């Protein structure tokens, strides 16, 4: 009987762990951590509308600010991570932030790094109705400018 309970507990634990990994639950660390290695990208991002997205949404005089706005105007829908920071597109970085992991793209992806696609951008940048989403070509161009600089990992 004890063995059956033990096996059931092991199976349930395995399912819980695999479900958590599949869901992509990775802790967010904030752009200041990313800046430690990605200084050029951070400096390029810092002056963009993405960086100021939370402030801009709060300053809007024609719309009331709500928690729903944070889905696109903050990272991880949290005022603790204001603006559209690195992890809004690349996923929570706690599990891939170490240089030993980041120097291997496949290892970084296995630890939660998301390589954004157009669909990633479309999560917020589609449609003309601001009650849903808005397209700002300026923001999309800023995204390209941020990633124009490549910092290869040191050898």
What are these regions (language model features)?
Residues 3-7, 21-155:
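Short sequence/structural segments immediately N-terminal
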Residues 16-18:
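N-terminal signal peptide c-region/cleavage motif recognized by signal peptidases
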